[in-house]
Swiss-Prot record:
NCBIfam families (UniProt xref): L21
Organism classification: Bacteria, Pseudomonadati, Campylobacterota, Epsilonproteobacteria, Campylobacterales
PANTHER family to which the protein is assigned, alphabetical: 50S RIBOSOMAL PROTEIN L21 (PTHR21349), LARGE RIBOSOMAL SUBUNIT PROTEIN BL21M (PTHR21349:SF0)
Membership in a protein family: Belongs to the bacterial ribosomal protein bL21 family.
Name assigned to this protein: Large ribosomal subunit protein bL21
Signal peptide: none
Naturally occurring in which organism (per UniProt): Helicobacter pylori (strain HPAG1)
This protein's UniProt keywords: Ribonucleoprotein, Ribosomal protein, RNA-binding, rRNA-binding
Length: 104
């Protein structure tokens, strides 16, 4: 089973072909093809190769499925006996992609 570890938007993801991953918003149309070139490690046929920092010639091809927004995350901070409170909400924008091919 071959897999790859890549970096996108400051986060690292471990994927195999056919996986569906939520990445940070990329402003791409659905069915568009995307190449992810910041590949940190690739495992093919039991051989693991690491990059310094990226693997030379390795890339991951993915197809955009759709874009969306995540569930709202509420942060609430209350300072007792001070009549002071703060409430904030946050929704993450994401792009859902399907990994089609790992090229190493």
């Amino acid at each position: 089973m071959s897999y790859a570890i890549f970096k996108h938007g400051g986060k690292q993801y471990k994927v195999v072909e056919g996986d569906i991953v939520l990445l940070d918003k990329m402003d791409k149309e659905p069915k568009a093809l995307v190449e992810l070139v910041e590949v940190l490690a690739v495992s093919k046929e039991g051989k693991l190769s690491f990059g310094k920092p990226f693997v030379n010639g390795a890339k991951i091809e993915a197809e955009v499925i759709n874009e969306g927004r995540g569930k709202k995350v509420i942060t609430f901070k209350k300072r007792r006996r001070k009549d002071s409170k703060t409430k904030r909400g946050f929704r993450r924008d994401f792009t859902r992609v399907r990994i089609t091919k790992i090229v190493a």
